[in-house]
Amino acid sequence: IWRLAQQVKVRQRVIATAVTYFRRVYTRKSMSEYDPRLVAPTCLYLASKVEESTVQARLLVFYIKKMCGSDDKYRFEIKDILEMEMKLLEALDYYLVVFHPYRPLLQLLQDAGITDLTQFAWGLVNDTYKMDLILIYAPYMIALACIYIASVLKDKDTTSWFEELRVDMNIVKNISMEILDFYDTYKIDPQRGLPEDKISPVLNKLPAKS
Protein backbone atom coordinates (compact mmCIF):
# COMPACT_ATOMS: atom_id res chain seq x y z
CA ILE A 1 0.00 0.00 0.00
CA TRP A 2 2.80 2.43 0.92
CA ARG A 3 4.73 1.87 -2.30
CA LEU A 4 1.63 2.07 -4.45
CA ALA A 5 0.46 5.22 -2.66
CA GLN A 6 3.78 6.90 -3.44
CA GLN A 7 3.29 6.14 -7.13
CA VAL A 8 -0.22 7.60 -7.33
CA LYS A 9 0.69 10.46 -4.98
CA VAL A 10 -2.09 10.50 -2.40
CA ARG A 11 -2.22 12.27 0.96
CA GLN A 12 -0.93 10.58 4.09
CA ARG A 13 -4.45 10.41 5.51
CA VAL A 14 -5.55 8.30 2.52
CA ILE A 15 -2.66 5.91 3.15
CA ALA A 16 -3.50 5.70 6.85
CA THR A 17 -7.15 4.97 6.12
CA ALA A 18 -6.25 2.34 3.52
CA VAL A 19 -3.86 0.59 5.91
CA THR A 20 -6.52 0.62 8.63
CA TYR A 21 -9.06 -0.96 6.27
CA PHE A 22 -6.47 -3.57 5.27
CA ARG A 23 -5.82 -4.51 8.89
CA ARG A 24 -9.52 -4.51 9.78
CA VAL A 25 -10.33 -6.84 6.90
CA TYR A 26 -7.78 -9.42 7.99
CA THR A 27 -9.15 -9.54 11.51
CA ARG A 28 -12.21 -11.11 9.86
CA LYS A 29 -10.93 -12.74 6.68
CA SER A 30 -7.93 -14.93 5.93
CA MET A 31 -5.29 -14.15 3.32
CA SER A 32 -6.09 -17.43 1.60
CA GLU A 33 -9.67 -16.24 1.21
CA TYR A 34 -8.87 -12.67 0.18
CA ASP A 35 -5.63 -12.29 -1.79
CA PRO A 36 -3.65 -9.39 -0.24
CA ARG A 37 -2.30 -8.50 -3.69
CA LEU A 38 -5.85 -7.54 -4.61
CA VAL A 39 -7.02 -6.34 -1.20
CA ALA A 40 -4.18 -3.80 -0.85
CA PRO A 41 -4.95 -1.74 -3.98
CA THR A 42 -8.68 -2.06 -3.33
CA CYS A 43 -8.24 -0.66 0.18
CA LEU A 44 -6.31 2.26 -1.30
CA TYR A 45 -9.02 2.77 -3.92
CA LEU A 46 -11.78 2.71 -1.30
CA ALA A 47 -9.87 4.98 1.08
CA SER A 48 -9.20 7.51 -1.67
CA LYS A 49 -12.95 7.81 -2.25
CA VAL A 50 -13.81 8.03 1.43
CA GLU A 51 -11.16 10.72 1.96
CA GLU A 52 -12.37 12.60 -1.13
CA SER A 53 -9.09 12.16 -3.02
CA THR A 54 -10.28 9.60 -5.52
CA VAL A 55 -7.70 7.61 -7.47
CA GLN A 56 -8.93 5.79 -10.56
CA ALA A 57 -8.75 2.00 -10.42
CA ARG A 58 -7.01 1.86 -13.80
CA LEU A 59 -4.14 3.94 -12.40
CA LEU A 60 -3.73 1.55 -9.49
CA VAL A 61 -3.58 -1.44 -11.82
CA PHE A 62 -1.15 0.37 -14.13
CA TYR A 63 1.29 1.19 -11.33
CA ILE A 64 1.05 -2.22 -9.69
CA LYS A 65 1.96 -3.91 -12.95
CA LYS A 66 4.78 -1.42 -13.40
CA MET A 67 6.06 -2.15 -9.88
CA CYS A 68 5.84 -5.92 -10.36
CA GLY A 69 7.77 -5.89 -13.62
CA SER A 70 7.79 -8.51 -16.35
CA ASP A 71 9.09 -11.26 -14.09
CA ASP A 72 6.02 -11.16 -11.84
CA LYS A 73 2.87 -10.72 -13.89
CA TYR A 74 0.05 -9.12 -11.93
CA ARG A 75 -3.08 -11.04 -12.91
CA PHE A 76 -5.73 -8.70 -11.48
CA GLU A 77 -7.54 -6.11 -13.57
CA ILE A 78 -9.83 -3.11 -12.96
CA LYS A 79 -12.94 -5.30 -12.72
CA ASP A 80 -11.30 -7.34 -9.97
CA ILE A 81 -10.70 -4.23 -7.86
CA LEU A 82 -14.29 -3.11 -8.35
CA GLU A 83 -15.60 -6.54 -7.37
CA MET A 84 -13.31 -6.73 -4.35
CA GLU A 85 -14.48 -3.28 -3.27
CA MET A 86 -17.97 -4.66 -2.69
CA LYS A 87 -16.57 -7.62 -0.75
CA LEU A 88 -14.49 -5.30 1.42
CA LEU A 89 -17.50 -3.12 2.17
CA GLU A 90 -19.32 -6.20 3.39
CA ALA A 91 -16.31 -7.41 5.38
CA LEU A 92 -16.08 -3.99 7.03
CA ASP A 93 -19.84 -4.03 7.75
CA TYR A 94 -20.02 -0.85 5.67
CA TYR A 95 -18.36 1.02 8.53
CA LEU A 96 -15.76 3.22 6.84
CA VAL A 97 -15.14 5.85 9.50
CA VAL A 98 -11.55 5.93 10.76
CA PHE A 99 -10.32 8.21 13.52
CA HIS A 100 -6.60 8.91 13.17
CA PRO A 101 -4.05 10.27 15.68
CA TYR A 102 -3.15 13.24 13.48
CA ARG A 103 -5.75 15.73 14.70
CA PRO A 104 -5.28 15.00 18.44
CA LEU A 105 -1.52 15.11 17.85
CA LEU A 106 -1.69 18.70 16.63
CA GLN A 107 -4.06 19.72 19.42
CA LEU A 108 -1.92 18.12 22.13
CA LEU A 109 1.31 19.60 20.80
CA GLN A 110 -0.34 23.01 20.86
CA ASP A 111 -1.55 22.47 24.42
CA ALA A 112 1.91 21.36 25.55
CA GLY A 113 3.56 24.33 23.85
CA ILE A 114 5.91 22.18 21.81
CA THR A 115 4.67 22.69 18.27
CA ASP A 116 8.29 22.66 17.10
CA LEU A 117 8.13 18.87 17.52
CA THR A 118 5.27 18.55 15.04
CA GLN A 119 7.27 17.18 12.12
CA PHE A 120 9.15 14.64 14.22
CA ALA A 121 6.06 13.44 16.10
CA TRP A 122 4.07 13.32 12.85
CA GLY A 123 6.69 10.99 11.40
CA LEU A 124 6.35 8.72 14.42
CA VAL A 125 2.58 8.60 13.95
CA ASN A 126 3.08 7.66 10.29
CA ASP A 127 5.23 4.72 11.34
CA THR A 128 2.60 3.44 13.78
CA TYR A 129 0.55 2.38 10.77
CA LYS A 130 3.20 -0.25 10.10
CA MET A 131 1.96 -1.87 13.32
CA ASP A 132 -1.47 -2.88 14.63
CA LEU A 133 -1.73 0.00 17.11
CA ILE A 134 -4.65 1.70 15.34
CA LEU A 135 -6.75 -1.44 15.90
CA ILE A 136 -5.93 -1.62 19.60
CA TYR A 137 -5.56 1.85 21.08
CA ALA A 138 -7.48 5.12 20.98
CA PRO A 139 -5.97 7.56 18.45
CA TYR A 140 -5.26 10.21 21.10
CA MET A 141 -3.30 7.68 23.16
CA ILE A 142 -1.14 6.86 20.14
CA ALA A 143 -0.61 10.59 19.67
CA LEU A 144 0.47 10.96 23.31
CA ALA A 145 2.98 8.14 23.00
CA CYS A 146 4.50 9.73 19.90
CA ILE A 147 4.68 13.10 21.65
CA TYR A 148 6.40 11.53 24.62
CA ILE A 149 9.02 9.76 22.51
CA ALA A 150 9.63 12.89 20.45
CA SER A 151 9.97 15.09 23.54
CA VAL A 152 12.55 12.81 25.13
CA LEU A 153 14.61 12.45 21.96
CA LYS A 154 14.54 16.20 21.40
CA ASP A 155 15.29 16.97 25.07
CA LYS A 156 11.97 18.70 25.79
CA ASP A 157 10.83 18.52 29.41
CA THR A 158 7.16 17.51 29.30
CA THR A 159 7.08 15.73 32.66
CA SER A 160 4.74 18.17 34.40
CA TRP A 161 2.46 18.36 31.36
CA PHE A 162 2.08 14.59 31.26
CA GLU A 163 1.46 14.47 35.00
CA GLU A 164 -1.43 16.92 34.60
CA LEU A 165 -3.13 14.78 31.97
CA ARG A 166 -5.92 12.56 33.17
CA VAL A 167 -4.87 9.54 31.15
CA ASP A 168 -3.60 6.09 32.00
CA MET A 169 0.15 6.51 31.66
CA ASN A 170 0.60 2.75 31.70
CA ILE A 171 -1.16 2.62 28.34
CA VAL A 172 1.07 5.40 27.02
CA LYS A 173 4.05 3.39 28.25
CA ASN A 174 2.83 0.23 26.52
CA ILE A 175 2.33 2.04 23.23
CA SER A 176 5.74 3.70 23.53
CA MET A 177 7.36 0.31 24.13
CA GLU A 178 5.69 -1.16 21.06
CA ILE A 179 6.88 1.72 18.90
CA LEU A 180 10.41 1.47 20.27
CA ASP A 181 10.44 -2.31 19.81
CA PHE A 182 9.37 -1.82 16.20
CA TYR A 183 12.29 0.51 15.50
CA ASP A 184 14.69 -1.79 17.31
CA THR A 185 13.47 -4.94 15.56
CA TYR A 186 13.69 -3.48 12.07
CA LYS A 187 16.87 -1.49 12.77
CA ILE A 188 15.46 1.78 11.48
CA ASP A 189 18.05 4.35 10.40
CA PRO A 190 18.93 6.36 13.54
CA GLN A 191 18.67 9.58 11.55
CA ARG A 192 14.93 9.06 11.12
CA GLY A 193 14.26 6.43 13.74
CA LEU A 194 15.56 5.70 17.20
CA PRO A 195 19.20 4.99 18.07
CA GLU A 196 19.52 1.86 20.21
CA ASP A 197 21.12 3.77 23.08
CA LYS A 198 18.07 6.06 23.23
CA ILE A 199 15.51 3.32 23.84
CA SER A 200 16.16 2.63 27.53
CA PRO A 201 16.36 6.32 28.52
CA VAL A 202 13.01 6.97 26.85
CA LEU A 203 11.29 4.19 28.75
CA ASN A 204 12.98 5.04 32.04
CA LYS A 205 11.74 8.63 31.94
CA LEU A 206 8.15 7.67 31.22
CA PRO A 207 5.83 8.28 34.22
CA ALA A 208 4.50 4.93 35.40
CA LYS A 209 1.32 6.12 37.09
CA SER A 210 -1.81 7.76 35.78
Predicted regions span which residues?
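Structured all-alpha helical bundle cores of eukaryotic regulatory proteins
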Residues: 1-180
